[in-house]
Design a protein with these regions (language model features):
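N-terminal export and membrane-targeting signals
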Residues: 1-18
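C-terminal region of N-terminal signal peptides and the immediate post-cleavage residues
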Residues: 22-47, 58-60
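Extended ligand-binding regions for polar small-molecule ligands
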Residues: 41-69, 203, 268-306
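Periplasmic-binding protein-like
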Residues: 42-44, 172-180, 241, 245-284, ...
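Extracytoplasmic small-molecule ligand-binding "clamshell" domains
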Residues: 47-50, 56-151
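Alpha-to-beta junction loops
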Residues: 84, 144-153, 231-240, 253
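Bilobed "Venus flytrap"/periplasmic-binding protein-like clamshell domains
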Residues: 94, 105-120, 155-158, 174-226, ...
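Acidic, polar ligand-binding/catalytic clefts
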Residues: 118, 125-191
Length: 316
């Protein structure tokens, strides 16, 4: 491997190792450093949803009004407990990552979930938000079992997941793309037929990699993919451009290639047992869209220009 990659490889290893050591829970986020990133999330013409009866972008419940905690609701139970339990990522730079300098999990997703906690408790105290670091594979079972109240984990709203979980309205529009080393001759996923392409085990990307006749290499964390790419063990990484942008920021010897492969609309995952909580969360997200907080968070964590704010569409 080229020696110039080693410092960046070391950073990826540190982030992965420290993330694994953190385990189940972490403290609330502290302000981080903004990234220098050039957009890339504007709306584009990409693959349409596979099922005509399902529209992931218009599958959530309409808010009943401003976010309010009324007696007997799930939000009231959370308030009585004293804290919201959120399943989050700890290895996706910009969105949910463990900052090795302060030991805090921080990022765009964390800002979204912190706003939900603030709306429930009426203040932004970190004591009211418990962050539980989970892998991609843990997202669905942890929501369904009640291990967490909500998941903010770069989680794509899909027709399959909607069978088991409810989601908020779309809070971020991403698109699946491909990341390779800068010396790669590949220009799209189609050029990687017969070659190894990394993705996390529970991501939607794995099936699309296989469909392109590439060889999926599933791992637990996205930083594991970056290490494999740097070591030459895989030819590429394919997932949401939001995640790939974070990996590219950690290694300047990588580049994104090809057109968008599929839409990846992100939503906050919630149990189907708590529709009132879905409506509450959607009311919070609507406030973030209109009061400037969404744009401020994007600017802080992801950079400029700020992408168009995803507009809410509801099923009922």
């Amino acid at each position: 491997m080229n020696a110039r990659l080693r410092p960046w490889r070391a950073l990826a290893v540190v982030l992965t190792a420290s993330g694994l050591a953190l385990g189940a829970a972490a403290a609330a986020a502290a302000p981080g450093q903004p990234s220098a990133r050039s957009g890339g999330h504007a709306a584009r013409a990409v693959t349409a949803p596979a099922a005509s009866t399902c529209d992931p972008k218009a599958s959530s419940l309409r808010p009943a009004g401003p976010p309010q905690v009324t007696p007997g609701t799930f939000m009231a139970k959370i308030r009585a407990r004293g804290y919201l339990v959120a399943g989050v990522d700890q290895s996706t730079y910009h969105f949910g990552f463990l900052n090795p300098l302060n030991g805090q999990i921080e990022g765009f997703d964390i800002d979204m979930i912190r706003a939900v906690a603030t709306a429930i408790f009426g203040d932004a105290s970190s004591a009211h938000l418990h962050l539980k670091a989970i892998s991609d594979e843990q997202r669905k079972p942890d929501v369904m079992s009640g291990t967490v109240d909500i998941v903010a984990h770069t989680m794509t709203i899909s027709c399959d997941r909607l069978k088991y979980l409810d989601f908020s309205s779309v809070y971020f529009d991403a698109h699946q793309r491909v990341l390779v080393l800068k010396n790669s001759k590949a220009t799209s996923l189609d050029d990687l037929r017969g070659q190894k392409v990394c993705a996390t085990t529970a991501s939607d990307s794995v099936a699309r990699i296989a469909a392109a006749k590439a060889i999926p290499v599933p791992v637990t964390y996205w930083t594991d993919c970056l290490v494999l790419l740097q070591q030459g063990d895989v030819a590429a990484i394919s997932t949401d451009d939001a995640i790939l942008d974070g990996l590219a920021a950690q290694d300047p010897w990588t580049k994104l290639i090809g057109p968008p492969i599929a839409d990846e609309p992100y939503g906050l995952a919630i149990s189907k047992q708590h529709p009132e909580f879905v409506r509450f969360v959607n009311a919070v997200l609507q406030q973030l869209r209109t009061n400037g907080q969404w744009a401020a968070s994007y600017r802080h964590w992801i950079g400029t220009p700020v992408a168009p704010i995803p507009q809410a569409h509801y099923a009922g």
